[in-house]
């Protein structure tokens, strides 16, 4: 029997995990100088990716190689809906969205303040998106973020506000998945919302938090999976090893990533949507 060590910090693992750990013949984990003696299959993480999957996923797949071998050659992932879900969401869109244009999903808020692009900047990007596509917009956010969303909407022009489809705001993870299946793209804060869209084969444009190393989480494919990070414009001020310093300066760093820096890339992506 084999056991794969979770890709988390050791301190977070309960003592019951370690008691069970001893009974496994094959123990697989990432190679570290202080844990190599525990595993009989130590995995050295690759540093560069020549595939379209980002490093964060490839590192986890590496843990399965001793068990599955070359069965991992196909690393694409897909999210599927039931026929009933497809029918229900299609009917909901027909009743809610005017015209025949598919909406654009906006990942309006990150999981926390450290992963949320300043809303005054996001408002500018939403305006650009509407001016470029004239498409309906859906805002994705958690209920606790409603006040910030209200602030965001107040910053928008009347025509853009009207394009916001409040009746289609997702109210659960599964609801988000089925809603995105009917959208033409997902744009905004990098995170789970963007990654789910990739699993549905939707074009995405992600704005990374300055504290996240994009190389581990993103693979650029023009007009398909695109992203921006402060390091693209100010590499001299970004040190991914000094995360504590970046967290302390998160607001200042975010404000440096002005929409004008990537306006051309943003609009170019939107113009290619179908």
Feature map (PLM): residue ranges:
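Catalytic machinery of carbohydrate-active enzymes
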Residues: 1-274
